[in-house]
Amino acid sequence: MKKALAIVALVAAMFVAGNVQAQSTIYATYAPETFVAGSNSTNYQGFSVGFSQNIDLAKGIGVAAGAQFRMNMRNTTQTIWGITGKTNETQTIIDVPILINYKVAVNRDLAIIPFVGPMPSLALTGVTKGADPLFGENSYNWYGDNSNQSRFNLYAVFGADVKFTNFNLFGGYRLGLLDLDKTDNASLKTNGLFVGLGFTL
């Protein structure tokens, strides 16, 4: 709960900061994620929508703080002894990226803007649903009472934005820094690429 309140406080601070000369941008991204557990990895499809407010700190240097809603999804089908089972996994997340950026103006309309910074992340839901003719339907809550998986993560994010007038084409990488497995004998980390389109209001 304290972590959730901290993220809410960060988002509220961004709205306050919006009253100081700031540029607001809305965006959508394709953001697949890889879950790495020891030597095993599992790939999820991912998408997000969000907004950011960029505040100028000095000539060419700014900080963009925002919030985004992100979803990871994975569907699998497996047949054993003629019985086909299907599994659907879905995770929803709120991210709060806080990115330092440096604007390199190519001309009046075009700029290249590299960025880097932390991104606190809070998982809202995580569910695995399965169905097969033999056992019927079942589900597992990733964050239930008996779960060993943490909701909170902290990413290091870096990438670049190509801005043409009010349009943004950007991409980068996010690296999960925290071990999401609460036990001592296992580990779970996440990472992923992202590409997106944005519009500066």
Please tell me what each predicted stretch does.
Residues 32-36, 80-84, 138-144:
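Extracytoplasmic loops and strand-loop junctions of Gram-negative outer membrane beta-barrel proteins
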Residues 48, 95, 190-194:
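Short hydrophobic/aromatic beta-strand or adjacent loop that forms the aromatic wall/cage
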Residues 68-91:
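Surface-exposed loop and membrane-interface regions of Gram-negative outer-membrane beta-barrel proteins
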Residues 36-39, 76-81, 181-183:
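Short acidic, glycine/proline-rich loop/turn micro-motifs
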Residues 45-75:
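N-terminal, post-signal-peptide region of Sec/Tat-exported proteins
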Residues 1-23:
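Cleavable N-terminal export/targeting peptides
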Residues 55-61, 86-182, 186-188, 200-201:
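Outer-membrane beta-barrel transmembrane domain signature
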Residues 20-55:
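Short glycine/proline- and aromatic-enriched beta-strand/turn motifs that initiate or cap beta-hairpins
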